[in-house]
């Protein structure tokens, strides 16, 4: 009996064995090319680049943190302001009245003073609390009494020895600058009638 036997797997086995014979060192032929891509040698610079591009290592837990920069902040705690008022310098009030006659002179001057409050000092204090918008203000005004002439009176008693027909009175008031002066004049004339009349004053 004559027949044919078909072995499908035999062809593949034969090809594999043929490739194996070609790749074996006993065949005397050079090795077949590898299906893997060719290997190219990397330069040292390329290796360094690849090394540096690797993921950075996780920071150590025991690494000391950088010192925090501490800056002190200046906040207003107390603020004071004072204003000093320099009043006018003290004036010496002198009121002199002088009457000059050809005879004796006699003077009686009266000056009345009264304390008048005058601003002598002024101060203001502002207190600011830190980290707060609260403010405290305090103002102080100092008043001190200073004498001031309110009324001036002068009386002159005359004992004439040599009677004259005209008299003049001058009053000088020195209240600082400028000075003030006042003058008054009195003129007398003889009366034939000894009885007092409207034209003859009985009291000087």
Swiss-Prot record:
Major localisation? cytoplasm
Its tissue distribution reads: Detected in various tissues, with highest expression in lung, followed by spleen.
Q: What induces it?
A: Up-regulated during chondrocyte differentiation.
The consequence of inactivating this gene is:
No visible phenotype; probably due to redundancy with RFLNB. RFLNA and RFLNB double mutant mice exhibit severe skeletal malformations, as characterized by scoliosis, kyphosis, intervertebral disks defects, vertebral fusion in the spine and longitudinal bone growth retardation. Chondrocyte maturation is accelerated in double mutant mice.
Superkingdom of the source? Eukaryota
Reply yes or no: does the keyword Repeat apply.
no
Q: Report biased composition (Pro residues) as residue ranges.
A: 28-38
Q: Which Pfam families match?
A: FAM101 (PF15068)
Q: Name one GO cellular component term.
A: actin filament bundle
- Residues covered by region (Disordered): 1-52
Q: Which InterPro entries match?
A: Refilin
UniProt KW keywords: Cytoplasm, Cytoskeleton, Methylation
Chain positions found as Asymmetric dimethylarginine: 151
Annotated transmembrane regions: none
What is its subcellular localisation?
A: Cytoplasm, Cytoskeleton
Record GO biological process:
actin filament bundle organization; negative regulation of bone mineralization involved in bone maturation; negative regulation of chondrocyte development; skeletal system morphogenesis
The entry lists its GO molecular-function terms as: filamin binding
Compositionally biased spans, kind Basic and acidic residues = 12-21
Q: Give the quaternary structure.
A: Interacts with FLNA and FLNB.
The family this protein is said to belong to: Belongs to the Refilin family.
Q: What does this protein do?
A: Involved in the regulation of the perinuclear actin network and nuclear shape through interaction with filamins. Plays an essential role in the formation of cartilaginous skeletal elements.
Please identify the protein, giving its name as recorded: Refilin-A
């Amino acid at each position: 009996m004559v027949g044919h036997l078909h072995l499908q797997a035999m062809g593949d086995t034969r090809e594999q064995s043929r490739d194996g014979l070609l790749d074996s060192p006993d065949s005397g032929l050079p090795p077949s090319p590898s299906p893997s891509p060719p290997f190219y040698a990397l330069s040292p610079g390329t290796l360094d680049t690849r090394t540096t591009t690797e993921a950075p290592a996780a920071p150590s837990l025991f690494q000391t943190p950088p010192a925090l920069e501490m800056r002190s902040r200046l906040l207003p705690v107390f603020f004071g302001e004072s204003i000093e008022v320099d009043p006018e310098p003290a004036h010496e009030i002198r009121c002199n009245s002088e009457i000059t006659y050809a005879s004796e002179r006699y003077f009686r001057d009266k000056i009345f003073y009264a304390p008048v409050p005058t601003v002598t000092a002024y101060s203001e204090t502002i207190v600011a609390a830190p980290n707060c918008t609260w403010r405290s203000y305090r103002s102080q005004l100092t008043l001190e009494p200073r004498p001031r002439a309110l009324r001036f009176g002068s009386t002159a008693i005359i004992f004439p020895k040599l009677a004259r027909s005209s008299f003049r009175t001058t009053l000088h008031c020195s209240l600082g600058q400028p000075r003030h002066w006042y003058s008054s004049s009195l003129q007398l004339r003889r009366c034939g009638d000894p009885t007092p009349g409207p034209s003859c004053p009985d009291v000087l």
